[in-house]
Amino acid sequence: MSLFDKKHLVTQADALPGRNTPMPIATLHAVNEHSMTNVPAGMEIAYFAMGCFWGVERLFWQLPGVYSTAAGYAGGYTPNPTYREVCSGQTGHAEAVRIVYDPAVIRYEQLLQTFWENHDPTQGMQQGNDHGTQYRSAIYPLTPEQNAAAHASRERFQAAMAAAGDHRPITTEIAHATPFYYAEDEHQQYLHKNPYGYCGIGGIGVCLPPDA
């Protein structure tokens, strides 16, 4: 598949078949030693895609109220894809991060603020120097409330961009969450294990106005 093709989403009919077996990952988060899979009572889940998941995961695990994070794949068709398959552009997935958070400490709207202010949501099928459908900007809401908040935040951020003189249209995908597949264990908490590793995310200098 050529680089040109990787800028266009594969159809479900043409996606790779994948496999039934999930990727094996460590039981505990390498940074805070919380469970990588369990969701404690009262906590909620959010899914975001904003480029290379190494830097995105680190961005969110540093936030107060975030219980755990995981790198993975969302928004595609191929079950339990490998990193190589996702990078081929033939699975339909975006590199995404699963965030388990305590809404009593950090609100979903605060996670959205981190999302919008720390990448460029106008670049379509790339983020910075990373090209391909897996690097697209996306929010995958799990509830009607998350969906409404995501759409409202996109409108506010687009208006804030215009006020700052940036009239590029936002290309961020907002779609109901499809299955999230954990990435291989080597990608989990990658920048903790490899402190000098690559991190290609960065904002555009615009702040998300607060919700009403």
Swiss-Prot record:
Catalytic reactions of this protein: L-methionyl-[protein] + [thioredoxin]-disulfide + H2O = L-methionyl-(S)-S-oxide-[protein] + [thioredoxin]-dithiol; [thioredoxin]-disulfide + L-methionine + H2O = L-methionine (S)-S-oxide + [thioredoxin]-dithiol
Any Gene Ontology biological process: protein modification process
Record GO cellular component, one term: cytoplasm
SUPFAM superfamilies with a match to the protein in the record: Peptide methionine sulfoxide reductase (SSF55068)
Keyword Kinase annotated: no
InterPro entries in UniProt: Met_Sox_Rdtase_MsrA_dom, Met_Sox_Rdtase_MsrA_sf, MsrA_MetSO_reductase
Entry keyword set: Oxidoreductase
Molecular-function GO terms, alphabetical: L-methionine-(S)-S-oxide reductase activity; peptide-methionine (S)-S-oxide reductase activity
Pfam family, one: PMSR
Active site residues of this protein: 52
Known EC number: 1.8.4.11
Protein family membership: Belongs to the MsrA Met sulfoxide reductase family.
Function: Has an important function as a repair enzyme for proteins that have been inactivated by oxidation. Catalyzes the reversible oxidation-reduction of methionine sulfoxide in proteins to methionine.
Record protein name field: Peptide methionine sulfoxide reductase MsrA
